[in-house]
């Protein structure tokens, strides 16, 4: 493999890793919403948590 292909593989792994880790851990909804609701991070959990889904309707970033 050439150096460009190696870099491409590394990039894909780095982008995918957080999503894989998140799906694996499935943190509890209450802790996510306590710390993330009202922040942009909340949106990534909107499908999983009812409280973050309600936060999603009127997100306050920051």
From Swiss-Prot:
Record has Nuclease as a keyword: no
Residues recorded as bearing Tyrosine amide in the entry: 61
Span of the signal peptide: 1-23
Alphabetized UniProt keyword annotations: Amidation, Antibiotic, Antimicrobial, Disulfide bond, Signal
UniProt key word 4Fe-4S: no
Disulfide pairings: 29-55, 33-51, 37-49, 42-52
PTM field: The amidated form is probably the active form.
One Gene Ontology biological process: killing of cells of another organism
Family: Belongs to the paralithocin family.
Role according to the record: Has weak antibacterial activity, mainly against marine Gram-positive bacteria like C.maltaromaticum (MIC=200 uM), C.mobile (MIC=100 uM), C.divergens (MIC=200 uM) and C.funditum (MIC=200 uM) but also against C.glutamicum (MIC=50 uM). Has very little or no activity against Gram-negative bacteria.
Protein name: Paralithocin 1
